[in-house]
Design a protein with these regions (language model features):
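Conserved internal helical-beta-strand scaffold that buttresses enzyme catalytic cores
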Residues: 1-158
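Conserved small/polar residues in nucleotide/adenosyl-binding loops
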Residues: 169-175
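Short helix-loop-beta junction
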Residues: 164-168
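Short, surface-exposed alpha-helical segments at coil->helix boundaries
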Residues: 159-163
Length: 175
């Protein structure tokens, strides 16, 4: 917040999501459990599993308040990524922030999904275009090696690192 950042939009799948809701965004465990117990009021029932629900909160940091939002995530692995990027881009446009200095997109991936889902390459390919630029995205990749059902790691992808798909793209860190 002290550097001018006043928000972050987070996209992630199910693994670790409840932890992020409670420990990073400050959702009260009793509220989370009430959703699972079906005792929490639902204004508009989504019909989706509870751990796919989104949430946002204002978190106090030493530099000031920061608004964090965790995007709703459907059961389609990695599809939340362009949604988060679009949300951040819309906020940039609304705030007249052409360099993306106020809201940070953060995406959390599993290693297999990062390398294996085409939506990631598509999102990366658009990252530097004028209509989709967000100033940069933090990608957190969990190398848990459980995304594929193959027994030999040599059969999971063609490269040593799941992040090697990023070598196709360049970025100007000075922006």
């Amino acid at each position: 917040a002290s550097a001018g950042l006043d928000g972050a939009a987070i996209g992630m799948a199910h693994r670790g999501r409840l932890n992020v809701l409670v420990n990073s965004l400050g959702k009260m465990p009793k509220d989370l459990f009430a959703e699972f117990d079906h005792t929490a009021p639902e204004d508009l029932p989504a019909g989706d599993v509870k751990y796919h629900q989104g949430f946002s909160s204002d978190v106090t940091t030493p530099g000031g308040p920061v608004h964090l939002s965790l995007a709703f995530n459907p059961s389609h692995l990695e599809i939340v990524n362009p949604v988060v990027e679009g949300s951040v881009r819309a906020r940039m446009d609304r705030r007249a922030d052409p360099h993306g200095k106020q809201v940070l997109p953060v995406l959390v991936h599993g290693d297999a999904a990062f390398a294996g889902q085409g939506v990631n390459q598509e999102t990366l390919a658009l990252a530097q275009t004028r209509g989709y630029y967000t100033g940069g995205t933090v990608h957190i990749i969990i190398n848990n090696q459980i995304g594929f059902t193959t027994s030999d790691p040599r059969d999971t992808r063609s490269t040593l690192y799941c992040t090697d798909i990023c070598l196709l793209y360049t970025s100007d860190a000075a922006d």
